[in-house]
Structures are given as C-alpha cells and as structure tokens.
C-alpha cells in the first residue's frame, strides 16, 4: 500500500510560514512539535484524517550544525519542497526507487512529542 501522506512547505521561520499559509488558505495551522536531532520543528494543516500539509522550519532551540534545520535556515525562500508517501513497507519503496536510479538513503527512525504530550514515532526514507 502506498498513498500520499503529506506535502512539506519549507520556511526559514515557522511563525512566518504559519502566517503565510493562513493568508493563502484562510485556515490557521496548528503547532506540531520539534524533531530532536534533525534541527527542525513543524506546524500542521490537515487535509483529512491522515493527509496534511507540514510547515517545516529550523528549530531555534536546537544546534542546527549539519542538520536539515541548517539547510532550511540558509534558504530565505518559502515554498513546497517535498512530498511524502505512507507505506507499510519502506524497504520495498527504497528498492523500487533504486531500480529507477533514484538515490535513497537508509531508513531512519523519527520521533517527536506533540504539544499535548503524545509521543509519536515513525520511520522515514529520503
């Protein structure tokens, strides 16, 4: 099973990005949380129960050196940067990408805590 999970809207400043999306859509995004060790934090705008727009930005509370947050901080432009699919078999997705000459990194474990204290965990493949 493969389906669209979310779109990533990258911004150099999360509050500014939330304001931009609110002005574009008329819908106010909600705070998501921080991605420890990745240098990012996010806000979310739901499309449905399991599809959303992620507004992702550098996390000023983290050391950004060598992280995705550092890359976002260096780019002053906001915009749609990536999309993500959900799958119950990321290894198969990685293999399909490799067969199509698309470079894929290793699958990594990710986690964050929501503002209301719920722990979330998932696997990620770039």
Describe every region a protein language model picked out.
Residues 27-71, 118-126:
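Conserved short beta-strand elements that form part of the metal-binding/catalytic scaffold
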Residues 19, 55, 65, 93-95:
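Short acidic, gly/pro-rich beta-turn/loop elements at beta-sheet edges
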Residues 1-44:
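An N-terminus-focused feature that recognizes amino-terminal "leader" regions
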Residues 3-13, 41-48, 53, 67-126:
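Vicinal oxygen chelate
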